[in-house]
C-alpha cells in the first residue's frame, strides 16, 4: 500500500563512479533500485545531478541527489499516502515538485531511483512478477522475450583504441529461444576472442566498459570483418545479424565528421554526412548489418531523414531522441529514424519511459531497450523489455557481471513463463506480429 520509508545512498557503478541507490519500504518489505549512468550522453538528456566537488570522486559525487531524496522527495511521498501501485501519480508528484523541464532541480538520477523502487514495490504489492506489473502499467497483455544485441567490439568513447564507431553488436535472430540466443552469443564471443588474440596479440583481448573487446584498430570495416570471421568460425552465419552504434555526435566537427577523432585534430580529413552515409551503405552491402544507431549528429536532422529514406534497415535514434517525447515527435514528423533506443535514465521516470515507448510503437517504430555504459547489478531493464514487448535489448557483451545480471534475469523470466514464453527472433523489429 503506502510507502513507509525511503532511504537513498551513494554507491559505485561499474566504472567506479558514484551513483544513486534507493531503498523503499512498505509493509511487504524493502525494495531496492540503483541508477545507471552514460559515457556518451546526448545533450538533450534529462540532467544527471553531480556534486562537482573536485575534492570528492573528481567532482562526480551524487550526495546532492541523495540529499534531495532523503530530505525532500521521501517525506513528500510518505506523507502523500499514495499507494505504490499508483506509479503515475507518484512519478507526477516528483515531476511537479521538481518543476523543471529537464529535472535539473532534483536530478533525473534522484527521481529515477525512487521511480524504479516504487515500481518494484508495486509488483510486490500486487503479488505479481515485476515484468507483469510493468506490462499492466503499459496496458500490455502480451509478454515477449527480446533478441539480445551483444556489444562485442567497443570503440568511440567507450574504448582507448583508435576506432571511431562506438559499438559493433551481434544479434542472434535465428535462435530458437532467449536461452539459445545467449548460448550463440557467448560462443561467438569466445570465437571472437581467439580471432582477436591471433591477429593482434593477447593484450588486444582486454575488455571495455561494456564487456566487449577493444583491439587497436582504426578502420571500422576491420571490426565488421572480425565479427564476420568469428560468426563463421562459430558456425552461425545464418543465425546472426550485425548491429552498430556509431554515436556520431562524438566525432561531429563543424558540420562534418572525423573518423579519426582520437588522433590530433586535422580538418582536412573530415568527411561530409553524404560521404558517411555512403560508407554505411557499403557496410550494409558487404556485411549482414541490419541496424545502425546514431549514424549522424543529434542535430543533423537532414542527414538522418535522407539516410533513413534510402535504406531498408533499422535506424535507431539515441542521442537524437534521448527517450524524450518531444524529440520523438519531431523525429516521427521528419522521418528521421524508425526505431527508438529506450534508456530509462535519459528521461528519468518509469511513467515517462513507458509513454516514450508507446509513442514510438504507435508510430510504427521499433524500440530497443538499453543499459548505460556505467551500470549496476540492478536488473530492472530485463523485466522492462519483456513487459513492453519491444523485441530487442542491448546490455553489453556476455561478459562482466553488471551486464550478465540483466541477461541472466531474462533467462529466468523465460523459464518462469514456460510454454507461454515467446522469443522475438527474426521479428525483433516488429514483435507485435508474433
From Swiss-Prot:
It is found in: Cytoplasm. The active site is at 210 (proton donor), 343 (proton acceptor). Its main location: cytoplasm. GO terms for biological process: glycolytic process. InterPro entries: Enolase, Enolase-like_C_sf, Enolase-like_N, Enolase_C, Enolase_CS, Enolase_N. It comes from the Eukaryota. It catalyses: (2R)-2-phosphoglycerate = phosphoenolpyruvate + H2O. Pathway: Carbohydrate degradation; glycolysis; pyruvate from D-glyceraldehyde 3-phosphate: step 4/5. The keyword Lyase applies. The keyword Transmembrane does not apply. Its cofactor is Mg(2+). Signal peptide: none annotated. GO terms for molecular function: magnesium ion binding; phosphopyruvate hydratase activity. GO terms for cellular component: cytosol; phosphopyruvate hydratase complex. Mg(2+) binds at residues 245, 293, 318. Substrate binds at residues 158, 167, 293, 318, 370-373, 394. Pfam families: Enolase_C (PF00113), Enolase_N (PF03952). Its EC number is 4.2.1.11. Expressed in the brain and, to much less but significant extents, in the pituitary and adrenal glands. Gene3D superfamilies: Enolase-like C-terminal domain (3.20.20.120), Enolase-like, N-terminal domain (3.30.390.10). Keywords: Cytoplasm, Glycolysis, Lyase, Magnesium, Metal-binding. Belongs to the enolase family. PANTHER family: ENOLASE, GAMMA-ENOLASE. HAMAP family: Enolase. This is Gamma-enolase. The gene is ENO2.
Amino acid at each position: 500500500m503506502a510507502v513507509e520509508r525511503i532511504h537513498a545512498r551513494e554507491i559505485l557503478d561499474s566504472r567506479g563512479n558514484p551513483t544513486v541507490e534507493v531503498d523503499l519500504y512498505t509493509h511487504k518489505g524493502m525494495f531496492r533500485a540503483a541508477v545507471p549512468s552514460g559515457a556518451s550522453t546526448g545533450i538533450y538528456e534529462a540532467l544527471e545531478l553531480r556534486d562537482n566537488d573536485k575534492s570528492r570522486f573528481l567532482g562526480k559525487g551524487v550526495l546532492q541527489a541523495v540529499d534531495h531524496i532523503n530530505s525532500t522527495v521521501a517525506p513528500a511521498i510518505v506523507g502523500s499516502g499514495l499507494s505504490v501501485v499508483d506509479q503515475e501519480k507518484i512519478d507526477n508528484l516528483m515531476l511537479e515538485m521538481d518543476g523543471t523541464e529537464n529535472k535539473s532541480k532534483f536530478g533525473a538520477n534522484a527521481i529515477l531511483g525512487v521511480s524504479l523502487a516504487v515500481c518494484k514495490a508495486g509488483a510486490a504489492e500486487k503479488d505479481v512478477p515485476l515484468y507483469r506489473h510493468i506490462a499492466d502499467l503499459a496496458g500490455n497483455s502480451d509478454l515477449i522475450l527480446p533478441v539480445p544485441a551483444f556489444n562485442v567490439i567497443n570503440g568511440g568513447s567507450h574504448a582507448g583504441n583508435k576506432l571511431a564507431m562506438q559499438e559493433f553488436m551481434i544479434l542472434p535472430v535465428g535462435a530458437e529461444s532467449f536461452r539459445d540466443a545467449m548460448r550463440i552469443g557467448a560462443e561467438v564471443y569466445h570465437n571472437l576472442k581467439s580471432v582477436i588474440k591471433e591477429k593482434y596479440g593477447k593484450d588486444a583481448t582486454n575488455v571495455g566498459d561494456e564487456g566487449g573487446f577493444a583491439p587497436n584498430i582504426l578502420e571500422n570495416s576491420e571490426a565488421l570483418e572480425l565479427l564476420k570471421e568469428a560468426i563463421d568460425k562459430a558456425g552461425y552465419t545464418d543465425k546472426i545479424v550485425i548491429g552498430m552504434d556509431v554515436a556520431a555526435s562524438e566525432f561531429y566537427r563543424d558540420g562534418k565528421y572525423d573518423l579519426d577523432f582520437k588522433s590530433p585534430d586535422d580538418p582536412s580529413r573530415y568527411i561530409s554526412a553524404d560521404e558517411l552515409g555512403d560508407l554505411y551503405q557499403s557496410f550494409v552491402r558487404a556485411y549482414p548489418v541490419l541496424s545502425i544507431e546514431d549514424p549522424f549528429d543529434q542535430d543533423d536532422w537532414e542527414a538522418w531523414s535522407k539516410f533513413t529514406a534510402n535504406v531498408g534497415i533499422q535506424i535507431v535514434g539515441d542521442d537524437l531522441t534521448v527517450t524524450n517525447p518531444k524529440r520523438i515527435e519531431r523525429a516521427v514528423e521528419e522521418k528521421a529514424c524508425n526505431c527508438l533506443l529506450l534508456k530509462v535514465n535519459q528521461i528519468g521516470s518509469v511513467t515517462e519511459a513507458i509513454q516514450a515507448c508507446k509513442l514510438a510503437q504507435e508510430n510504427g517504430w521499433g524500440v530497443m531497450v538499453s543499459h548505460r555504459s556505467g551500470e549496476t547489478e540492478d536488473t530492472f531493464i530485463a523485466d522492462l523489455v519483456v513487459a513492453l514487448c519491444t523485441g530487442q535489448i542491448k546490455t553489453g557483451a556476455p561478459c562482466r557481471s553488471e551486464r550478465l545480471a540483466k541477461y541472466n534475469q531474462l533467462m529466468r523470466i523465460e523459464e518462469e513463463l514456460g510454454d507461454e514464453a515467446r522469443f522475438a527472433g527474426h521479428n525483433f523489429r516488429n514483435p507485435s506480429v508474433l
